[in-house]
């Protein structure tokens, strides 16, 4: 829905000259406990007493005593019913769909409140689903020399627009982009980096196209589709590794 909002914003701007969906991105927990769980292995709850145990989240079988208490209390806020799985009772609840939080990542000059809030205001931020990946993105013109620089990031700040800011049209010259991504060493490797282009026709009709700009294992994007073939990496559904 974020990408849909961006496209709607472009359509509204084409029609009304204003874009109410010109926002940056951060990740967060949305918990109601005052505490955060940013790892699935350490996830304890989202709303406290209602889902504060594995049993209440449908992750572990309930005892007969707990089932009796829930049925007597008419706790339909928690329980939609019970499921019999291999002879054991599990709570059937929407809380099974909740999990560890995302993270807000901010490119700030210093680790101070002032610098961090300045980065929020200029939207030089990004969101992750919990892994501590790092992503930088710059756009500009004539950026070919950036790869020859001793400090490409410093050069990009001086000669390009940062993520979240506006990149103005330069006559008919096509913009160039610098993307830098670093995996979380404690999580799975990165499969690919994508740039998603959104634009509108003069009528305001929106369009979207996805480009794979970097892929793992030496894979190259197809010249027609702009996408790489799927990697051979698989996920073990028994342990999610």
Locations of regions flagged by a protein language model:
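C-terminal functional module detector
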Residues: 1-241
């Amino acid at each position: 829905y974020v990408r849909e909002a961006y496209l709607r914003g472009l359509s509204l701007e084409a029609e009304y000259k204003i874009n109410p969906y010109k926002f940056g991105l951060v990740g967060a927990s949305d918990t109601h406990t005052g505490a955060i769980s940013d790892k699935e292995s350490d996830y304890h709850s989202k709303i406290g007493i209602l889902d504060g145990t594995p049993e209440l989240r449908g992750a572990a079988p309930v005892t007969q005593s707990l089932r009796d208490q829930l049925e007597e209390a008419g706790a339909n806020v928690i329980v939609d019913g019970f499921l019999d799985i291999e002879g054991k009772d599990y709570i059937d609840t929407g809380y099974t769909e909740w999990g560890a939080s995302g993270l807000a990542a901010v490119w700030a000059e210093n680790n101070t409140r002032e610098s961090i809030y300045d980065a929020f205001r200029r939207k030089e931020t990004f969101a992750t689903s919990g892994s501590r990946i790092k992503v930088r993105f710059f756009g500009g013109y004539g950026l070919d020399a950036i790869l020859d620089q001793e400090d490409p990031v410093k050069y990009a700040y001086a000669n390009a627009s940062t993520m979240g800011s506006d990149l103005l049209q330069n006559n008919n010259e096509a913009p160039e982009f610098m993307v830098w991504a670093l995996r979380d060493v404690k999580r799975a490797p990165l499969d690919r980096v994508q740039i998603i282009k959104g634009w509108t026709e003069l009528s305001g009709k929106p369009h979207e196209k996805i480009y794979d700009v970097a892929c793992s294992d030496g894979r190259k994007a197809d010249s027609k589709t702009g996408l790489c073939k799927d990697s051979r990496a698989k996920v073990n559904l028994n342990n999610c590794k």
